[in-house]
Amino acid sequence: MAAHSKKLTLIACLLFALGAAETAPAKRVVSLVPAVTEMLFAIGAGPQVAAVSSYDDFPPDVAGLPRVGALLDPDVERILALRPDLVISYGSQTSLQSQLASARVPVFDYRHAGLEGIFDTLHRLGPAVGRRSEAERLISDLRAQLGRVRTRVRGKARPRTLLVFGREPGSLRGLYVSGGRGFLHDMLEIAGGVDVFADVDRESVQPSQETLLARAPEVILEVRAKGLAGGADAPAQERRVWSRLFSIPAVKSDRIHFLSGDYLVVPGPRVGRATEDFARALHPDAFQ
């Protein structure tokens, strides 16, 4: 019974948010989702952002904004004290959403998905903040960017690629790689690679070294929000880490690429740039 009541509260919260978005665009937005924060600024709604999450650092305009926690530790009291008329939250933050519903604060429900999910989020976000045309224009621009990348790599051999987005420095422990779902997987496919874990219906996979040997990637593409630690020697040091799996084709041919930058791992307005960088690593000749 309690679970049913909680579900009804959440539904009411989301319906209230939808109704609010249709009648009056939000003027004071609190965003707990860095990807959506980027979208807000990209469609010209930056001045309407009243606070952001603890992890927001782009665009630079967010530097002076109040911080209200993040996915696991949202500060409800501080959020309410800011008197927002829209809060961007993750779909999994059901407790927060229920509390906001009780305070009659509209919620924009964000759910992590693939590239199409980015377009869907923008399509819903634009009207909610009075920026419908700007959001649709950004969607069009992003689709055009991705289309240009597809054109560049069309007809190229598609290497079997291991896309790594998490690993302990100097080690092959704590390995996280792209599975067959999610925006990273979608970007890799557009960039002209074949995800070696495309058959795994998850966004991330934690493979053993034995599994990596069996999958035999032809290219290893590592993406990190921050650069490699260790200065100019870092790439060589990290290549030596991968050399432990010397029988993997990517290691044999030294087709190991390290890309760094937060834009590479955020499902937001910079995915076109990130996808092009993937393609440049996989098919450098297509950009000469």
Predicted regions and their residues:
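Bacterial N-terminal signal peptides that target proteins for export
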Residues: 1-11
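Bacterial N-terminal signal peptides
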Residues: 9-19
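A short, structured surface patch at a secondary-structure boundary
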Residues: 27-82, 86-96, 196, 224
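Extracytoplasmic substrate-binding proteins
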Residues: 28, 95-172, 194-199, 251-288
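Short secondary-structure boundary segments
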Residues: 33, 91-92, 165-167, 200, ...
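His/Asp/Glu-enriched short active-site or ligand-binding loop at hydrolase and phosphoryl-transfer sites
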Residues: 53, 178-204, 222-224, 258
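Short helices/loops that flank or line small-molecule/ion binding pockets
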Residues: 76-83, 103, 207-216
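A ligand-binding cleft/hinge motif common to bilobed small-molecule-binding domains
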Residues: 94-102, 219-239
